[in-house]
Structure formats: structure tokens, C-alpha cells
Amino acid sequence: MEFLPGPQHPPGPPTMDLEEPKGPEVPSENHPSNTQSALGPGGPVTLSEMELDTSSVQELVQQLEALPSDLGGPFPDGAPCPLHIATGQGLATQENPDAGGLLSAEAGGDDLLGLLRDEASSPAQSVPQDPAQTAPRLLQPPEDPDGDPGWMEGASAEPADSRSSSSSPEPWLETAPLVTQQEPPVGTQSRETLASCPAVTEVPGPCGPEELMDGVIFGAKYLGSTQLLSERSPAPSTRMGQAQEAMDRVKAPEGETQPMVEVDIFISTKRVKVLAADSQDALMDHALQTISYIADIGPVLVLMARRRLARRTTPQDRQRRLYKMLCHVFHSEDAQLIAQAIGQAFSIAYSQFLQENRIDPSQVGTQPSTAASHPHNGDLDHFCNSQNCREVCIQKRPGEGLGVALVESGWGSLLPTAVIANLLHGGPAERCGALSIGDRVTAINGTSLVGLSLAACQAAVREVRRLSSVTLSIIHCPPVTTAVIRRPHVREQLGFCVEDGIICSLLRGGAAERGGVRVGHRIIEVNGQSVVAMPHARIIQLLTETREIHIKTMPAATYRLLTGQEQPVYL
């Protein structure tokens, strides 16, 4: 094969450098590179000294077509052929011929042949070209960053979708772009979006947000675990009762030895783990979203994790959707801090979810719901249920009493009226079968009793003794009312006073009044634990050791009548 020596700069298009632009030095016309050479009749000629005018290109095309299809073998004369080197074959056999390219390993031999043909035929085109634009140029990024992201000069006029990403019209000029265009990742957000999302640092709690992301550890003593069946979203009072039941199952009675194990509770925004204190082995591992409830009852911490039961067969069972609650009971002086840390982890995880998904909190209802913004009140729940409001017609003999004993609903009640405290056995009220202890009497024969004193209500009942038919407007309520008191901290006062288990005074507008506590009621249970026969000091301890208190009360007069401490006066 014979190679033509490079002419001495004849008039025409400028020379084209075939040296790889990715090297440490880019050869120019004035400084030809000698890294690659071809042996020709005129002596060694570097590739940078070769000029690809029309005649040279035509002869190179003919030489390339005359070569065998397999360019992997060495050149017969022992010296490498420039085209052999240009096609990326070198002196070694390529393992993957499809991956070979022109210096930059971007194009194969077929691409080179097509490119040389295009280059040879380009001068014959009749379209006039600006001489200043005939010289090939390296790809340059656009000067206007807001303009078209595509490359400007040196870019192909061919549509972008008409060639593959692994080749280009001028692969020896295609280098790594000076400014690469990168699409923002999916998780990136604009400053406006980040500003609209809740900041992780704004979540209150005992731990720092960064600490919870990495994980914090609290020391505790593991008492034991038990299982309970529960619905998916029971009422808070039900949750507290379940926590109390789990504690009663696991915790040893007072005076007995309580077996316990030293553990570490690991809390993060992903998981809650129970680790052995000595070996740090994971004893229990729960994803954060499976934690259903955390109750701190004094120094006792109850951690409840949800697990779905097997698929139910009947439609009733599928609608009920029972879950298995794994209740872990711990003893720690930092039980309240542990419960707060888990709650803070939930808040931070939710804030991270909003930020990562670029969700505006105002559009997904991150504000507290109406039900959560109002404190729980047992009376209000019953009053809002229209099925509890009914009218009862009692048939009796003229001159016969109704056979009901009435008491006051208590100061602070949402509906101040008379309450049925007892029913005479065999009397007209009991015979009708529609009345029960705890029902609120709002009217009698159309006359309202709401807001009247107990004496006025009793007088209105006595006036209907002469009638044979009496209609009572009632609201069905259980004899025991549940009040829920929520405080930001245990140091905040409850807002009521207790004497011998009876609420004797109430702070107007306090947490107790908002939760449904009423003066004159006797406390029956505190957080699921009966206090009927409990000493006064112990009752005060139960009321002050937790931030959220669930109290079951009933009118003290009703309690005395039901326990036989007083004799009822039937009307």
C-alpha cells in the first residue's frame, strides 16, 4: 500500500488534524505530533501532516475498500497502517469489534467508510458555503445558558434521532463537551418547593433531627411482650386501655419480683429496634410505620406494633380487618422521653417524605383535622349521634309515678339536664323497656328540662302523675362517661381538684373541662385501672404521672344509689 506525502499547504480547505483530541496535548498545524507515524515512499509521515483534500480522500476510500474485512491482524510489512490505527484496531486483536471506534472508540470501520465518502462527496455539492465556515470546529457549548441546550457550531445538521448515540458525523472532532447538560435528578427540588415544605429542624422533640436520622439509643429494662387483637384504628381511649391491659399482663404485681433484661431501644426515622445491652444483637425489629401506639404510664413504656392477620374468608371478617398487636413492655425512668422521641421520629419521617416527593403540605391536609383539633368529649359523641335521640312513650295508670330517680348531670356538662340514676323494678319506666340508667331527659310532654335545676325537673315529673300517657324526650347515654385530658407536659396542671375520688372543683377553660370532666362526678377508672377502692394518694399519683389521661366518671349520686349507699327517691 502506498501513501502520499503531505503537500506543502496548497490553497484550499485548511488541514484536518486526525490526532485524538483527548490526549494531554492537542497537536496543531505548527506543532505536528510524532506519536503516530506511517511509513511511505517519502519517509516517515505523521498523521498530523496529512491533508485530506479531495484526491487524498478518494484514494483513501479506494484503499479501504481494497483491504480485507478483518483488520485485526498485523500489517504485512510489520508497520501499522494509518487506517489500521485510525479504526482503533492497533496491532492487537480486538475482542469486541463492535465496540471499536475512530480514535475515540465511537465508530467502527463501516462508519469510517461512510464518513470518508461523505467527506469526498461534500465538495461536489452545488450549495455554496461560507469559506469561514468550511473549517471543522470542535463542539462548543452555547453561550446563552437559557437558550437551546444543544451544541451550536460543529454540531451535525442531521436530526438528532437519525443516528445512534455511539457515533457522530465527525467523530474525530467529537470530544467530551466543555459543559455537560445534566437533567436534575428526580428527587431535586427548586428553592420555592423546598421553602413550601416543612423544615426538618422545625419538628419539636427531645432529639435533634440529624440524630434521629442516624438513630438514637435509650437504655431500658425489658419486662416482656404480649399479643392483642385490635381493629386498625380504634379510639384513643381504646388504645390506652389496650396498653394498660398489656402492662397488667406482663408487669408483676406489687410485692413480687419482676424479671427484667437490660436492653437498648434504638429509634430512627426508619425503624425501632430492641438491642441486647451487652452484645447489641437485635432482639426485636419493627419498621417505624408499623408502630401503632406508644404509652408512657409512669416509668412503664408500652410499645405497640401492628401485624396483619391472615386473610379472612367471610365478608364480615374482611370488613372488620383485625390486626395482631405486639405489645412490648419496658421499664425506664426516661419512658416519657422515649415516647416523645418515637413521636418526633414520625414527624421527621413525614417531613422527609413531603420534601423528597415535592408535596405541598397545604394540599395534603397536614393541618390537624377537625376531629384532632377538638378535645375528646364523651357526651358530645353521644349527642351528635342522631340515633341516640329518641322519644319514649310510657303508658301507666293515672296517679301512678313513672318510677324513675333523677340526679343532676353535673356542673360543666355540655347539656345541663336531669339524668336517670335508677329505675323502679316493675315500674312504668322499666316496663316500657326503652329507658336505661344514664339517659338524659331533655323534655317531658314537650316541655324542655334543659337548664333547669334538679328540683324543677323533679317537680315537672310529679305533675304528670295524673296522666295515663307520658312522652319523654331523651338522649341515650351510658351511665359512665369517658373524659380525655391531654397536656403538653406532666408539669402542666390538670385543672380540677379531687377529694376522696370525687371531682369537687373545676378550672374554667382548663384541660379538664375541655376534656369532659364535670364537678360532682366520681372517678371510676384512670387509664383503664379501677380506682373505686384505691387510696386517695394513689389516685393523685395516677392522675399526675402521664400527659394523656383517660378518666371514666359517673355522677356521684348515681354511684351512691347503685352501690346502696343511699336509697333512691322514685318519682
Curated annotation (Swiss-Prot):
Subunit description: Binds to the cytoplasmic domain of amyloid protein (APP). Interacts with HIF1AN (via N-terminus). Interacts with NECAB3; seems to mediate the interaction between NECAB3 and HIF1AN.
Compositionally biased tracts (Low complexity): 98-115, 155-171
Stretch list, region Disordered: 1-48, 67-195
InterPro entries documented for this protein: APP-Binding, PDZ, PDZ_sf, PH-like_dom_sf, PTB/PI_dom
Protein name: Amyloid-beta A4 precursor protein-binding family A member 3
Disulfide-linked positions: none
Gene: Apba3
Tissue and organ distribution: Ubiquitous.
Biased composition (Polar residues): 122-132, 178-193
Superkingdom, taxonomy of origin: Eukaryota
Protein's organism: Mus musculus (Mouse)
Gene3D superfamilies: 2.30.42.10, Pleckstrin-homology domain (PH domain)/Phosphotyrosine-binding domain (PTB)
PROSITE patterns in the record: PDZ (PS50106), PID (PS01179)
PDZ domain segment(s): 391-477, 482-556
Subcellular location: Cytoplasm, Perinuclear region
A single GO molecular function term of this UniProt record: enzyme binding
Domain PID: 214-378
Keywords recorded for this protein, A-Z: Acetylation, Cytoplasm, Phosphoprotein, Protein transport, Repeat, Transport
Residue numbers carrying N-acetylmethionine: M1
Residues with Phosphoserine modification: S168, S369
A single BP term in Gene Ontology: chemical synaptic transmission
GO cellular component annotations of the record: perinuclear region of cytoplasm; synapse
UniProt entry tagged with the keyword Transport: yes
Keyword Protein transport: yes
